[in-house]
C-alpha cells in the first residue's frame, strides 16, 4: 500500500500498475513512454521514475525480480535477434537504472526475459498487444517452500 500511494500519480496516468499477489508485489511498467517501439533504450524522462521505484523497494525485504515481456509479433530489428533478446535487454535496462540508487543492493536483483510467454491479454488487437509489452518489477517476499527430497531407486 505504501508503494501504491507513493506511485499514485503514475498509476493514475496509466504508466504503472501495482498489484499485491500475497507473497509478491508486482510493479508493472507499460512500454508506452518507457521504451521506444522495438527498443530496450530506457527513455531519459522515465529514468527518474525507475529510480524512485528502486528507492521505494530498497528497504522492502526480498528478492527483486525484473522481468521483460513482449507481444507475439515478430521483431524486425538489426539490434535484437528476437523477442527473447528484446525482453531481456529491457529488463537489464531497468535493473541497471535501479542499481544507480544509493543503498540499493544489486545482490537482490534477478533479471529475466520472458518474450511473449506470459501475456496479460491475448494478442488479437494492437491495444491488447501493447498491454503485453511491459517490464515488471516483482518483490518476492518470503522464502520459497521446497518439498522434501524424493528418493529414486533404480530398477534392476
Where in the sequence are the language-model features?
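Structured segments of extracytoplasmic/periplasmic soluble domains
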Residues: 6-10, 53-56, 60-63, 94-97, ...
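Short beta-strand elements
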Residues: 12-21, 62-68, 107-110
